[in-house]
UniProtKB/Swiss-Prot annotation:
GO CC list: endospore-forming forespore
Keyword Protease in annotation: no
One Pfam short name: SspH
Coiled-coil ranges (or none): none
Region annotation (Disordered) ranges: 39-60
Gene: sspH1
Superkingdom of the organism of origin: Bacteria
Name recorded for this polypeptide: Small, acid-soluble spore protein H 1
InterPro entries with a match to the protein in the record: SASP_SspH
């Protein structure tokens, strides 16, 4: 995924189907300069982590 699309998803009120390492996640914040996103698994909001945006996959 590119940084621009990750930012669009993070800003959208519509929930997108995005995964990180096969697990569905929620994008909390995108740092466009560093190319990283703060995410958490849908089933565990307390498990926040920063990951490269390129490692996120959007599914339709």
């Amino acid at each position: 995924m590119d940084v621009r699309r990750a930012q669009e998803i993070a800003s959208s009120p519509v929930m997108a189907n995005v995964t990180y390492n096969g697990q569905r996640i929620y994008i909390e914040h995108v740092d466009q300069q560093k190319g990283v996103a703060t995410i958490h698994p849908l089933d565990n909001p307390n498990q926040k982590q920063s990951v490269p945006v390129a490692s996120l996959e959007e599914h339709s």
